[in-house]
A protein has these predicted regions:
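Metallocarboxypeptidase
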Residues: 1-113
Length: 113
């Protein structure tokens, strides 16, 4: 509830939900295709080198990104950073940071109106 309330207060243009398995990006939820989300997801994939994937049905319905897309009808992304078993080794930090810096910068600069 706290995260939902905080998100409603901030009213963000998009959200990034970070997880740590797979070096991929999930961009959609339950047949809801938000305007501009696919193009932005493709840009995030290009910047990070991660693959862009549809959210698997079995993985949907429980995440922050899924709730955000449904509630706000705005772009939301789950970024699966890193490889291996959790907890990921600290040695992956520099690579994960380098792979995600472009995503973070692009998201922070905002969406074109």
């Amino acid at each position: 509830r706290a995260l939902a309330s905080f998100t409603q207060y901030l009213d963000p243009a998009l959200v990034l939900a970070y997880h740590t398995q797979g070096q991929l990006i999930y961009w959609n939820f339950d047949d809801i295709e938000v305007s501009g989300a696919l193009a932005l997801g493709r840009e995030f994939a290009r910047l990070s080198g991660y693959s862009l994937e549809n959210t698997p049905y079995a993985s949907g319905f429980a995440g922050y990104k899924d709730w955000f897309i449904k509630a706000f009808r705005r772009p939301g992304f789950t970024i699966e950073a890193g490889l291996g078993e959790n907890p990921l080794p600290l040695e992956q930090f520099d690579t994960i940071y380098a792979n995600n810096l472009g995503i973070l910068t692009t998201a922070a600069l905002g969406l074109p109106e």
